[in-house]
UniProtKB/Swiss-Prot annotation:
This is Ribose-5-phosphate isomerase A. The active site is at E103. Its EC number is 5.3.1.6. One of its GO terms (biological process) is pentose-phosphate shunt, non-oxidative branch. It comes from Photorhabdus laumondii subsp. laumondii (strain DSM 15139 / CIP 105565 / TT01). Belongs to the ribose 5-phosphate isomerase family. It catalyses: aldehydo-D-ribose 5-phosphate = D-ribulose 5-phosphate. Gene3D superfamilies: 3.30.70.260, 3.40.50.1360. Pathway: Carbohydrate degradation; pentose phosphate pathway; D-ribose 5-phosphate from D-ribulose 5-phosphate (non-oxidative stage): step 1/1. The keyword Isomerase applies. Catalyzes the reversible conversion of ribose-5-phosphate to ribulose 5-phosphate. Keywords: Isomerase. Coiled coil: none annotated.
């Protein structure tokens, strides 16, 4: 199976965790896109979705799935999204698609976070994939200097503006041995909106696409 076929397999496998009559939290990216396709097949069985990006919102609407504003829901039964990296503690790096802040908000609201990935995303130590940090534009240089102090090599993601009107710094050369601590440290830097470490609120269930099929991992 190709990598995209593995992504499709986990996207459709996630339907098993969707409760009829609920609003579903939906992520962003190539794997989440397959889940949206799958969700379209049961659109008459769900109330709708809350989306983490304009791109996902557009796709959901194109499939006839109602999209609710995050402020319209008190909680979500489930949030389904991919990851750029995930470790054995189900902590993740996310934000390759620049939707990390909205993804983190939806993860916080959701009772259950189902992470859908292909096996290539599994790592022992987070950090080989550059760590995205969403930053208010006027603070870009200051935040970059602070990230250097933490041992990283930040690079400005050119020609990218988030759905919130901010910029992204991708932090290279990190071996993240304590993801929760680093998440807290970076989030305390003035001008940081959020960091793409999902460590304090990790996944509850991981669906991992392998050549032998979809593996379900729980804590």
């Amino acid at each position: 199976m190709t990598q995209d076929e593995l992504k499709k397999a986990v996207g459709w496998a996630a339907l098993e965790f969707v409760t009829p009559g609920t609003v579903v939290g939906v992520g962003t990216g190539s794997t989440a896109s397959h889940f949206i396709d799958a969700l379209g097949s049961i659109k008459d069985q769900i109330e709708g979705a809350v989306s983490s990006s304009e791109a996902s919102t557009e796709k959901l609407k194109s499939l006839g799935i109602p999209v609710f504003d995050c402020n319209e829901v008190d909680s979500l039964d489930i949030y389904v999204d991919g990851a750029d990296e995930i470790n054995g503690n189900m902590q993740m790096i996310k934000g390759g698609g620049a939707a990390l802040t909205r993804e983190k908000i939806i993860a916080a609201i959701a009772k259950k976070f189902v992470c859908i990935v292909d096996a290539s995303k599994k790592v022992e130590v987070l950090g080989k994939f550059p760590l995205p940090v969403e930053v208010i534009p006027m603070a870009r240089a200051y935040v970059a200097r602070e990230l250097v102090k933490l041992g990283g090599v930040p690079k400005y993601r050119q020609n990218v503006v988030t759905d919130n009107g901010n910029v992204i710094l991708d932090v290279h050369n990190l071996a993240i041995l304590d993801p929760a601590e680093l998440e807290n440290k970076i989030n305390r830097i003035s001008g940081v909106v959020t960091v793409g470490l999902f460590a304090n609120r990790g996944a509850d269930i991981v669906l991992m696409g392998t050549l032998d099929g979809v593996e379900t991992i729980t804590q």
